[in-house]
């Protein structure tokens, strides 16, 4: 049941045990459009809704509304949401939260295990931006993201994604529900 709820869709023709051998994956993560400067809150909402839908107990994981999430994350110190606030908010809901400097192999590893990631993208001097990575497609050399400022399943050129991600020191957040036992990622995020 969990496998069908995760709705992993293979984008390529091969599916191997090694995430590096696959042509691509996509996770059906619900989309939430952001209000001004609330990409972090929208990203948290997407992650919470994803795990709510994927829960084997029929959605027993409670999902706060987007306005409640935004209120819980709003900062008087910044025009947006700090990554540390997202981590603390998810932890307050008893999620297992890991923030780490990601690498491309981390994206492939976690997505192939049914775990969407929130990543920070640099914006050339403007405010940084959070998106939810939902997949990748090697033949097209793209990363699939839910961009709360734009739309679901936005295709980003992998090279441009990497450059933008590096502007935030490859900031990555993995949030797992309390019902999912998991060991902490290693120092390289796995």
What annotation goes with each model-predicted range?
Residues 26-54:
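N-terminal targeting signals for Sec/Tat export/insertion, comprising classic cleavable signal peptides
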Residues 15-30, 48, 61-189:
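Conserved active-site-adjacent core of cysteine acyl-enzyme catalytic domains
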